[in-house]
């Protein structure tokens, strides 16, 4: 023992336990046997009949050596590895392949391999061994002299022969109904095949293979990796489930199958993906985090004298011992509670229960669990494990016989360990409560989990580390069971400076809310994390062993039932993200092909040597699942980064074109995507790949030209808006064209909001009929950087409509709010940036639901038979009708998608027929309505010159004619009334005449605002009066007898005028409209309620009592004019414009006419409406008046009741 030990329980190296007996083969523990004679079980002698240490060690050794040559190893490493592999699988002694078969057979028992299958497999394996030795020798010879042509020829020939031989041999190891006992053989053979296929990628080109041959071998490696992985997992699960039983003994066998085939099969399968040299082009560090359980520490001595004879049930043991999926953790302290069993002088102090504390990698707090019975102990032993790793346990299981039966217990344990920070310093702690006179049996963990090699001491060659200890409620039910993790899973999450580092996500220290740890599918080397909603998975810490300036890329192995955006945070700051595709369908099982890699190519650094790193997923639709196996950190060097960027750019460029025609652009490649690929190429290093960059740039330019050629939009790059009325974009005021920025490479547009939804912001263009093909689907698509309430329409037979609100992205630059720029202030698109949401799609197709809030959008429209005479074309409209609305969009395209077939063809034919039927019906209706409307309009004027109104034409008649005109349906598109529709020409013709009538009528009426459409403007008011809406009319309401309304009007002396008033009187009294000059020449129109009798109260006054000497106080010059000045002032207001829609708002309204395209109240507000007739009770009175001066007064009043005035007109008589 070491003199420097800290206490009496700590020693250097393993403790030796003296043997006390050699009679372990048989045990007689019956109550009537003499205890001192019968309880003789040799210490140091393992008699577990299920264990085959040599078989397990072979699997452990091979997996351990493979972990050292993952990725692209050094040539010397590879030669040494193949020498080791051939020596392990084809040694000079007994055939390991046969041992593999026997080992599984012994565990499963009920399923044996037939002699013929066994003999065929062994013979074929022997042949493979010879082929491998031959290949290994040729490989070593060629590696010694790679330029030797003969060596190169020999190795190539032997490689091809061996690869073909093993490809055809593997089916012999998966014979039907014998897959389970052959599983270890199958896994080892599959491993050999995949390693061999890797060599083609490593050396094939040097051996003289063509790039096509090398690529073929690579594709076979990928295909067989999936096939072999799924086979191994499937038959492992099948074999395990077959062993599920009801007793403790069946659980022991079940657990051994789980443990031994994890070591010999699943551990290999977990490493298969890392053989991919294109994914792992440099040495790679992988980690196995799965747990395996050694057998319970109870005496096993035949069917009658073993602990499991009276142990707990299968399910009780499974529930008590096997932990639920959890984050990776390790022990920090063990407290053991001891109880005593005694029969006479025979004493067994046994492990009755324990408390363990454990921690996670850089976790801030510890957790603890309690097992067994911890009350009333005779002693308590505390064993610290802080910064120590236990690599071996030697346990002493005891049996104490009595008249009531045998009591089993664990009476001693030696923990061999190393210091985590000083692995060459070996230490040990032990639990030894004492015993006397009992039978004992040694349980050495090395028997079940042997070291990777016997050529080194155990403290250097160990394969596993103790991670947990569990047991049943009592030691009789289930003795303590040790749980172990593979030594490859470090306990610091250290990132290597010269390797790709794989870190399973279960090695995080804290789960985020919404994340669960689920059992691994068998091929991941451990458990995995799962989320059903967006958010971070877990919080991890990593440690660097090198300079902080080293840059990295992150890669995540994931599975998902939905497209999603995966992000990475470093040191708490979210700075990197990427959009990735779904890998599986909802409800499907997790298989090897369910997993894919999400690579975030942006390079980053760590701010500190110990930094946090978090993987998360942005919000995705409910009902979906996302699983993450691990993240990987890949070193970025200047050369590696340039090569990686070049490869990525090459793939991106190649992906633009179809596989059948390398000069044909894929339909689903958007114009925006081409721009982004061009950015990718332009950012390639001139120093490392100038020639390749030039070649790729020419291909991208060609793709851009193809994109321009197929785009049917005029001026897609927004050189102008409303610049040419016959082509290109037409838009409202306020739209701005912006030059390229960090998001768009070319021009884009900004659409602002509007304060009135009846005057929306709009941008539109028509695709001419001549550009379209019959029975073809077309697609409008583009890129929206940011929008709110953006409405998009495609209109032909009917309207395709979608409203998109796309939240603007956060700053794409790591330094938030600062956009990198070039020397001249241009956007620096090569600066490191976040890869933010570039591939979300919003595709609104027939029968499908559109995904909103996506930067990419697309709408489809189907075109039936084209007709150049009708020239329907397709209207493309962008519109915003809310104050908060806005949009920033570009890279717009309208392209031919595909010809219509099947149901789509039938659907468009039905839509076309329905539209044509409606059109024909509308033509017949329009012909009739137009004739009636034209007659009404013509009746307003004296002749067809439309420059002089009939003498009896009043405002009501004009409104009536306007009503007839507005019966013409579909003059403009209801979606955007600035766009003319089918009947625009005839509507604008007649409406122009109506405007002229209004203009002439207003010029003839000297009184301003005589219809009160502008409230009380131009009227002088005394007392309380009001202008109200009555039946869609503006009417003047006087309800107090002292109220007065007047207007001074300038007239022409010696000319005749007609005063015409339309009004309604309620209640008693009179309503009066008086016209007079300054002192005399007064006349009045009187309105009474003719329903009432002509009897008035004594206090009732009449209009004759009104003073005629009213002052003009309050009149404004703006409301005074001669009739010709009034005409001049309104000339522009009513000037017809045949090229623009109507903007006039008439006074009287009626319900909107029925439009087949739907009601649009804004169309009504702009004059596209009917007008109500005068309500019952209104009468029109008039008188002739001949002024003698240039000014007259119009006064309105009443004596009592309510007087309602609809209009007041003073019309100049014709000469």
From Swiss-Prot:
Superkingdom in the source lineage: Bacteria
Keyword RNA-binding applies: no
Molecular-function annotations in GO: signaling receptor binding; toxin activity
Pfam families: Cry1Ac_D5, Cry1Ac_dom-VII, Endotoxin_C, Endotoxin_C2, Endotoxin_M, Endotoxin_N
UniProt keyword annotations, A-Z: Sporulation, Toxin, Virulence
Keyword rRNA processing appears in the UniProt entry: no
GO biological process, one term: sporulation resulting in formation of a cellular spore
Family note: Belongs to the delta endotoxin family.
Note: Toxic segment of the protein is located in the N-terminus.
Role this protein plays: Promotes colloidosmotic lysis by binding to the midgut epithelial cells of insects. Selectively toxic to Artogeia rapae but not active on Plutella xylostella.
PANTHER family on file: ENDOTOXIN_N DOMAIN-CONTAINING PROTEIN-RELATED (PTHR37003), PESTICIDAL CRYSTAL PROTEIN N-TERMINAL DOMAIN-CONTAINING PROTEIN (PTHR37003:SF2)
Protein's name in the database: Pesticidal crystal protein Cry1Ka
Gene: cry1Ka
